[in-house]
Amino acid sequence: VNGLLNRTDGKILPIGLIPAGSGNSVLHDLDLITPAKAARAIIAGNTRFIDVAQIQMNHLLTYSINLIGWGLVTDVGKRSEAFRWLGPSRYTLSSIIEIFLRKTRKARLVIDQKTIVGQFSFIAACNSVHVGKGMKMAPSAELSDGLIDLLTVEGDITRRRLLSVLPKLFDGTHVNEPEVTYYQASSFSLYPETDDTLNIDGELLGTTPIDVSVLKHAI
């Protein structure tokens, strides 16, 4: 996606997607979760537009079609690198460790001109419903609606409540919990007190602060 949007000639080409990763989140949204089904869609020439989130950092411009995560979302990704030998289970172990550490960060979050200042456990901005391996992080998200869906867990949430809320990510019912706030926006900015690494489409990349805007039907 980054290579396509950085073309100097501005030409946009169709992208064929075949699931070969560990999560295949966007393909879950497209209902193309098997290689055979994805290949048939490509052969048939089935195309559709997808929005892209443009992320401006201090010295980097990058793009996302799935997830921009900050806080606990990134901490789990960082810690899991030490447990790669565990396979997919490394994320479960890393999540438990980070829940018990219960780190929060102070930040200013601006969502379509609305400003929120406070302590956050994590913020996740999603273009797709699914993140990771089948988690329904943003159940109201649409790949081509011109909006990005943000979830925040604010305040001093307890370990017990985190352990209760996070498993509900798999069926999307976490959005009904009082500690979770759900927004839809065309742009947002995040300014933490300290610079932190981000989780962008499953990769640890860049640092805050960031300014994000949705490029509707960019690919």
Language model feature labels by segment:
Residues 111, 117, 142, 152-219:
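ATP/nucleoside-binding phosphotransfer catalytic cores, i.e., glycine-rich phosphate-binding loops
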Residues 73-76, 117-119, 131-134, 158-161:
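Short acidic/glycine-rich loop or secondary-structure boundary segments that cap or lie
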Residues 49, 64, 103-105, 119, ...:
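A generic structural signal for well-ordered coil/turn residues at beta-strand boundaries
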Residues 69, 124-138, 204:
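Glycine-rich phosphate/pyrophosphate-binding beta-alpha loops
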Residues 5-6, 81-82, 139-142, 166-170:
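Short, solvent-exposed amphipathic alpha-helical segments in soluble enzyme
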Residues 5-121, 125:
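Catalytic core of DAGKc-family lipid kinases
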Residues 1-2, 123, 202:
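Conserved Motif II region of HX4D acyltransferases
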Residues 84-90, 139-160:
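Gly/Ser/Thr-rich active-site loops/lids in small-molecule metabolic enzymes
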